[in-house]
Design a protein with these regions (language model features):
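Hydrophobic alpha-helical transmembrane segments of polytopic
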Residues: 7-17, 70, 77, 99-107, ...
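Juxtamembrane loop-transmembrane helix junctions in multi-pass integral membrane proteins
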Residues: 2-9, 55-61, 65, 90-95, ...
């Protein structure tokens, strides 16, 4: 298959994954439970214990609000990724380089923060799959340039 198509579709898949993750955080009633094990480990208490305190009665609503905004931004990033990775647009070498630079920065920092802050999260596995996809894109980019 054509390297440009492989590059483009792989980036589109990364963007689609971002959109799906963002939608999950926006639509789930208790989004903090999507990664319960890592969150409980980080908090060093259960959510039940956290929410039982009188001073934390409004915390679930606040967390829901924060996760909704987070989901919105993840969806927006996914849409940008998809918008700039169509086969026609990625014919531009400069655009491919900028897309790879931005994605690389996002993936590197996401991997570092994930391992540092929530190492037991199941999202770590997804990050590594996305990193492998990103490396595949770099390989395809290099093939296009030859």
């Amino acid at each position: 298959m054509n390297s440009k198509i492989l590059f483009s579709y792989t980036i589109i898949i990364i963007g689609t994954v971002m959109i799906l993750l963002g939608a999950r955080w926006m639509l789930v009633d208790e989004p903090w439970m999507l990664d319960e094990v890592a969150n409980v480990e980080r908090l060093e208490m259960t959510f039940e214990e956290l929410f039982n305190s009188e001073s934390n009665k409004t915390l679930p609503g606040y967390l829901k609000q924060i996760y909704r905004f987070f989901g919105y931004w993840v969806i927006t990033i996914g849409l940008f990724i998809i918008s700039f990775s169509t086969p026609k647009l990625i014919e531009s070498n400069d655009l491919r380089k900028r897309l790879l630079l931005c994605l690389g920065f996002m993936m590197l920092l996401g991997t570092i923060l994930g391992h540092a802050l929530i190492p037991s999260s199941h999202f770590i596995y997804l990050v590594w799959i996305m990193n492998a996809s990103y490396l595949f894109c770099i390989f395809q980019h290099n093939k296009i340039n030859k």
